[in-house]
Amino acid sequence: MNKLFFIGIAAGLLACASQPDQNENLMKQIQTNEYFEFVKEKALEVVKTGFNAGDGYGEVWIRDYNTFIELSAEVFENHVLKENLMVFFRMQGDDGNIIDGFIPAEKAGGGYDYIYSELEPRYAGHKNTVETDQESSLVQSVYKYVQATGDNSILNEKAGEKTVAERLEWSMDFLMNHRHNEQYGLLWGATTADWGDVQPEHDWGVYLTDDTHYAIDIYDNAMFLIALENLMELLPEQKEKWQPVHQQIFNNCRKHLWDETNQKFIPHIYLDGSPFPDDFNENEIYYHGGTAVAIEAGLLSKNEIKTSVEKMAENVKLSGAGSIGLTMYPPYPEGFFKNEGMYPYGYQNGGDWTWFGGRMIQQLIKNDFAVEAYEHMQPMVKRVKDNDGFFEWYTVNNEPKGSGTFRGSAGVLWKAIQLFEKFTKENNQQ
């Protein structure tokens, strides 16, 4: 037999032998981590104070609530969590669309074109129409609520004449009827920076306008895939309807959005031209957040996940950022977005967001990359203690920005720590 064959066998046996030692060492690190307990306690402290996104926001946002509802379940009774979800259903649009967030009607005044509903007179709603993730976020939130509390009675609750179960499907129908592109078989939205809600063509950028350049991206479609999986688990009798849709979106994400040569997702498929200069090569940009959500949607193989985290680590090194929560690398150049906050490495254009970095950590743990997850978790939990809070985002120099009680960050880090503790428990039982 070939000598290389025996070398390969020996290497494989060595890897198998070292795995228990590696796991044992990691378990010790998890159990003695100097930041985990502080972060857990701080997360519970922050989430007790309410449901708005953070101290810089008056609204309860569904894309945020989706990432801390499980944490909220630790400190609030079921009916409180359920009531927040019911507000979104009572304010559902006549076409099935879901609002971004709601605020007490008497406090409405933040520049939005507010939405009102006879079913929910207490609140004013708003919707950033450049996004295509509100409906998916609500389905995921209801799923997490049921998983966390065991209370599936919410599915039979009524908002007006429709049950929650009916409204969940209606929200998915909205996406297929109003945000689905037939040519590519994928959902569309405005051009934004990865998962962001700011388009380049407007000073604020949260609404579709006559200048909008419509595009397809991985984040919106990966969120939809996760929502469809959740919906079919909540409503198994509807699986026959939604399974083919899920399969179509999954296949088309791989076909049209995955760049096999460069082992990354392309930023956008443009439906009516790009808002950026003709000589700009947008595919040089690597989207961290959309990639993390795509992994959650099951779109990448183990080898592709490994390549993804290696690329993210390299991007952090090249940019000088603090963590793999870096939204993208490189960022869009100066002046590409009319919103002045979207300067290179500013806000969603290359800011460092634990809110998405924490989701990548979760997926690394779930996909057997616990060692890498632990390594990349450290800067995120360290800065919580260093800054005594969960900040919305960080500059490339690791300086905290935005809300200091950003509940989405608290939620994803808390959940990641739960997964590390589960990993330790399961390995101790082996």
What are the language-model segments listed below?
Residues 2-7:
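Sec-dependent signal peptide recognition
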Residues 14-15:
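C-terminal motif of bacterial Sec signal peptides marking the signal peptidase cleavage site
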Residues 22-42, 60-61, 98-100, 173-176, ...:
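Catalytic cores of carbohydrate-active enzymes
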Residues 48-67, 73-75, 120-133, 206-223, ...:
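Solvent-exposed loop and edge beta-strand segments that line ligand/cofactor-binding
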Residues 58-86, 90-186, 218-221, 351-373, ...:
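Aromatic-rich carbohydrate-recognition surfaces in CAZymes
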Residues 111, 185-205:
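Carboxylate-rich helix-loop segments that flank metal/cofactor sites and access channels
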Residues 248-253, 298-306, 315, 319, ...:
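Long, repeat-rich segments with strong aromatic
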Residues 425-430:
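Long, intrinsically disordered, low-complexity segments
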